[in-house]
């Protein structure tokens, strides 16, 4: 009985030992993680992202290192500037382990090392700058920190990707002064912008008034030109009308005289008839205010005979009678050239010179004034 119990205990110990051996001989390393393996206390190899077999009780995993980029934020550090002002600056460092073996064997804690190195480098960089330079040179400080840290941590198997200054806090008294200065600057800029706006508004208003006066002067000028041209053409047309009327009146009188003489010649009056007509006309002539006394000459009949001889010739009975004038004695009409000129007096067509003058005035009126605010209105005829 005791032997059976002892056998069971021994068997259980063997099973447990086998389980321990199997557990010690297998290591599963996930992706983006590296395992540093030692054999008998010395570095053996580095594995990542695989199932690794280990020699039990001989090989062991010294450390597991995360290969992803890490973001480490350090607490604010007091830093003294060149003008002896203390600033509290906190930084953020982005780094990645590239050589796991160096990160394990070259430094005991690379995170603490990065923090201390960042603080030291930050003090060296900011110590050579004034407060104003520190506040306005973040990119320059970040670049210097990254260059120094990347070079210093290279032997630790690290790669510094980026360094950022998260905040720069000056002392409370300096903050109050800065706030006052910022307020004064804002008020100054506001006053400058207000003055600039007022000046621009005044300039625009003056420019508008100037252009309005220019346009008004141009309009008055063109109106005066058109009025003068219209008056000139009106006078010309009136003169042409009066000339045409005088011509028509003279032509009518000439036609009347021509018809009268033609009628007289066609009637062939005798001296007795002319004497009778003269005597019939004497009472009407005597009614005038300037005609008081009329004397009939004794040789009146002889005078009529002489007048008749000029216009007629004696007939068979010895009496002078009027004869129609020959064709060549008839009044001749004016030449075609004169008729064409006279016909032009009665033409109602628009004078081309008037049309050209109006077109020129409209073109000048529509021409935009240099620097004007708009296009002048079109003048209509």
UniProtKB/Swiss-Prot annotation:
<dbReference type="InterPro" id="IPR036013">
    <property type="entry name" value="Band_7/SPFH_dom_sf"/>
</dbReference>
<keyword id="KW-0472">Membrane</keyword>
<protein>
    <recommendedName>
        <fullName>Uncharacterized protein Rv1488</fullName>
    </recommendedName>
</protein>
<keyword id="KW-0812">Transmembrane</keyword>
<dbReference type="GO" id="GO:0005576">
    <property type="term" value="C:extracellular region"/>
</dbReference>
<dbReference type="InterPro" id="IPR018080">
    <property type="entry name" value="Band_7/stomatin-like_CS"/>
</dbReference>
<keyword id="KW-1133">Transmembrane helix</keyword>
<dbReference type="InterPro" id="IPR050710">
    <property type="entry name" value="Band7/mec-2_domain"/>
</dbReference>
<comment type="similarity">
    <text>Belongs to the band 7/mec-2 family.</text>
</comment>
<dbReference type="InterPro" id="IPR001972">
    <property type="entry name" value="Stomatin_HflK_fam"/>
</dbReference>
<dbReference type="InterPro" id="IPR001107">
    <property type="entry name" value="Band_7"/>
</dbReference>
<feature type="transmembrane region" description="Helical">
    <location>
        <begin position="3"/>
        <end position="23"/>
    </location>
</feature>
<dbReference type="Pfam" id="PF01145">
    <property type="entry name" value="Band_7"/>
</dbReference>
<dbReference type="GO" id="GO:0009274">
    <property type="term" value="C:peptidoglycan-based cell wall"/>
</dbReference>
<dbReference type="GO" id="GO:0005886">
    <property type="term" value="C:plasma membrane"/>
</dbReference>
């Amino acid at each position: 009985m005791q032997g059976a119990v002892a056998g069971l205990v021994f068997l259980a110990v063997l099973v447990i030992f086998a389980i321990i051996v199997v557990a010690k001989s297998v290591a599963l390393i996930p992706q983006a993680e590296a395992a540093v393996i030692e054999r008998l206390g010395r570095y053996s190899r580095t594995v990542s992202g695989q199932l690794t077999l280990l020699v039990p009780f001989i090989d062991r995993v010294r450390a597991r290192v995360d290969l992803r980029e890490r973001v480490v934020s350090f607490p604010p550090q007091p830093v003294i500037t060149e003008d002896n002002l203390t600033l509290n600056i906190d930084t953020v460092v982005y780094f990645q382990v590239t050589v796991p073996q160096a990160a394990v064997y070259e430094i005991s804690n690379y995170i603490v090392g990065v923090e201390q190195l960042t603080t030291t480098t930050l003090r060296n960089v900011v110590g050579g700058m004034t407060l104003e330079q520190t506040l306005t040179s973040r990119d320059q400080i970040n670049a210097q920190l990254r260059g120094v840290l990347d070079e210093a941590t290279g032997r630790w198997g690290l790669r510094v990707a980026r360094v950022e200054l998260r905040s720069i806090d000056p002392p409370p008294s300096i903050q109050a002064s800065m706030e006052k200065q910022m307020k004064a600057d804002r008020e100054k800029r506001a006053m400058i912008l207000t003055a600039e706006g007022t000046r621009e508004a005044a300039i625009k208003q003056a420019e508008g008034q100037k252009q309005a006066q220019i346009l008004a002067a141009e309009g008055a000028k063109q109106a005066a030109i058109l009025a003068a041209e219209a008056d000139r053409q009106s006078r010309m047309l009136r003169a042409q009308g009066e000339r045409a009327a005088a011509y028509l009146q003279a032509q009518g009188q000439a036609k009347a005289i021509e018809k009268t003489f033609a009628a007289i010649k066609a009637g062939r009056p005798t001296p007795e008839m002319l004497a009778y007509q003269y005597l019939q006309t004497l009472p009407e002539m005597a009614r005038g205010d300037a005609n008081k006394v009329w004397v009939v000459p004794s040789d009146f009949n002889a005078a009529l005979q002489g007048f008749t001889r000029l216009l007629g010739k004696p007939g068979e009975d010895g009496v002078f009678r009027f004869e129609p004038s020959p064709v060549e004695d008839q009044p001749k009409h004016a030449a075609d050239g004169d008729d064409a000129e006279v016909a032009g007096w009665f033409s109602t067509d628009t004078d081309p010179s008037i049309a050209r003058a109006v077109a020129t005035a409209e073109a000048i009126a529509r021409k935009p004034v240099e620097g004007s605010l708009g296009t002048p209105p079109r003048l209509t005829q």
